């Protein structure tokens, strides 16, 4: 497969969406719109988007943690088969808003299901497919939640509404992943002004893929 698979991770409020949108625009200017694909998890195709609705429905407060983890993995599998593999075979640059690291951090650590256990569950889903590069946008939990309250209070989902300690645990798991997989994960300080964050992300992508930016 000739494409490039780049995932973006980070705690809630890190600004992933804004960063990815700008990166997508600039890569489309460079390569053409047909060579760049934005996608997200859970979601990215009809079936996975339907699973997303179940996962983020604010009324599903009694969802079991393992159910949540398995639904994320199911959505991921369909996403890989329907979107990511065809995109890579077509030689596209894939910008993915969250991938398996999110499950490890949110369900493995945040829900207390075990990071190794969630990784094992997802092996069946990903079948060895991992991003060539993961951009981790790091921000303190308090700052991230404050951003959510100020800028997208009308778009809060079931996971956003978790307590501060949950989000702190998620962040610590992300930092552990960054330490354990330095060959894949690059950390960007997301507390900086958005323009600086974007410049850092572009430089990081260029360092990994010299033909981009």
From Swiss-Prot:
Gene Ontology MF: a single term:
dTMP kinase activity
So where does ATP get bound? 10-17
Instruction: Give the enzyme's main class according to its UniProt record, as a single word.
Output: transferase
CDD domains in the record: TMPK
Keyword list, A-Z: ATP-binding, Kinase, Nucleotide biosynthesis, Nucleotide-binding, Transferase
Superkingdom of source? Bacteria
Q: Does the keyword Protease apply?
A: no
Question: Which NCBIfam families has this protein been placed in?
Answer: DTMP_kinase
Q: Which PANTHER family match?
A: THYMIDYLATE KINASE, UMP-CMP KINASE 2, MITOCHONDRIAL
Protein task: Phosphorylation of dTMP to form dTDP in both de novo and salvage pathways of dTTP synthesis.
State what protein this is by name. Thymidylate kinase
- What species is given as this protein's source? Limosilactobacillus reuteri (strain DSM 20016)
Q: Which gene encodes it?
A: tmk
